[in-house]
């Protein structure tokens, strides 16, 4: 599609970035929602969630470089959209953690606080700019190491 055709659907470049960012965030949330409803232990769902988010970020960055760049621009311009996305993910994670507490898998903590801490501890796996800078570094924890560390922090 030519640039002229694109602007028949979008009023500006900013609108293109916003739409792309919303689409990526929607895909991220949908993946998280599907994982949250799997009939697995809370630990396994958290593991799949974190590694899935990382994989989605890496695949976008490597396979769709232009999309990755547009998402980064949208993140910088529309942080309020990212805040809403983080809150939705935190709520989803809190539900998984609550189920893990009820099953005796995790320590008895505030699920909302635990979800925020879990998500924050794994930001290097899903923030596009951080992933881009750290992907090939050998002196960083691997995604598996980070996820296992974060899950162990929730256990009794």
Locate each region found by the language model.
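Helix-turn-helix
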Residues: 1-15, 19
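A conserved beta-strand->loop->alpha-helix hinge within the catalytic CA
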Residues: 41-45, 110-113
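Amphipathic C-terminal alpha-helical segment
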Residues: 55-59, 90, 95, 99, ...
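Helix-loop "lid/cap" segments that line or gate small-molecule binding pockets
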Residues: 35-36, 51-58, 68-73, 150-154
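Alpha-helical structural segments
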Residues: 15-37, 44, 48-55, 59, ...
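Feature detects amphipathic, helix-rich regulatory segments
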Residues: 6, 18-21, 67, 71-72
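Hydrophobic/aromatic-rich alpha-helical bundle segments in the mid-to-C-terminal region
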Residues: 65-72, 79, 83, 101-147
């Amino acid at each position: 599609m030519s640039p002229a055709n694109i602007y028949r659907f979008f009023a500006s470049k900013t609108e293109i970035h916003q739409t792309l960012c919303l689409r990526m965030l929607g895909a991220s949330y949908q993946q998280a929602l599907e994982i949250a409803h799997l009939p697995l232990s809370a630990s396994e769902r958290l593991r799949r969630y974190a590694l899935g988010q990382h994989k989605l970020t890496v695949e976008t960055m490597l396979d769709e470089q232009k999309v990755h760049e547009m998402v980064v621009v949208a993140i910088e311009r529309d942080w309020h959209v990212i805040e809403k996305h983080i809150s939705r993910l935190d709520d989803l994670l809190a539900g998984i953690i609550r189920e893990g507490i009820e099953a005796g898998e995790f320590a008895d903590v505030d699920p909302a606080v635990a979800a925020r801490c879990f998500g924050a501890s794994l930001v290097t796996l899903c923030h596009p700019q951080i992933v881009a800078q750290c992907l090939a570094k050998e002196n960083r924890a691997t995604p598996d190491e980070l996820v296992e560390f974060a899950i162990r922090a929730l256990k009794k």
